[in-house]
């Protein structure tokens, strides 16, 4: 069976490195900023609904999340949110594009061993924004281990 395996593909976010905790922290700061307009739970629910509505147009990633945060802020505030607060939201979103890459334990060592064996093609197959994912891979220090990088707008069974 081992001889049949020629390619090993890895997801990136929350497989090779931690990602979701950064989004959760930004969402907490976002809901704190919008407290004058509702509870954290209500604002989070509104943000989630906006993200789901925008998914087919914007896809996944920090940029789509940022646009959804701005849209939700305008909605929950009845268009009353200040320009200063909108700028703060944009800065929250930009911070996701610069977040530190924290590899999960053993990732680099595992990839090194697999690469050195030379028996497998190693691939990253992940969803999200192309530029953001390429930048994260570069910041991770893992790019040299992979033979191919595939960033798609969504991962479905047919893809």
Task: Cite the ranges covered by each PLM segment.
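Substrate-recognition element of Asp-dependent hydrolases with the DxDx(T/V) motif
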Residues: 84-92, 96-103, 107-140, 149-155
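A metal-dependent, Asp-based hydrolase signature
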Residues: 36, 48-95
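Short, well-ordered alpha-helix to beta-strand connector turns
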Residues: 5, 146-147
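Active-site neighborhood of HAD-like aspartate-dependent phosphohydrolases
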Residues: 1-46
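A conserved mid-domain beta-alpha-beta active-site/ligand-binding segment of alpha/beta enzyme cores
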Residues: 159
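An amphipathic alpha-helix signature
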Residues: 23-31, 66, 70, 130
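Conserved H-loop
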Residues: 143
């Amino acid at each position: 069976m081992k001889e049949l395996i020629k390619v090993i593909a890895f997801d990136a976010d929350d497989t090779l490195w931690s990602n979701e905790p950064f989004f959760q922290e930004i969402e907490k700061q976002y809901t704190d900023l919008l407290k004058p307009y509702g509870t954290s739970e209500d604002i989070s629910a509104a943000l989630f609904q906006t993200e789901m509505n925008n998914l087919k147009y914007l896809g996944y990633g920090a940029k789509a999340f940022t646009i959804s945060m701005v849209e939700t802020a305008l909605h929950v505030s009845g268009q009353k949110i200040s320009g200063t607060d909108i700028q703060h939201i944009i800065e929250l979103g930009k911070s996701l594009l610069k977040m530190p890459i924290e590899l999960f334990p053993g990732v680099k060592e595992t990839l090194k061993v697999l690469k050195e064996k030379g028996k497998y093609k190693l691939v990253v197959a992940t969803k999200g924004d192309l530029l953001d994912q390429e930048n994260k891979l570069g910041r991770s220090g893992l790019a040299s281990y992979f033979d191919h990088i595939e960033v798609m707008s969504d991962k479905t069974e047919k893809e």
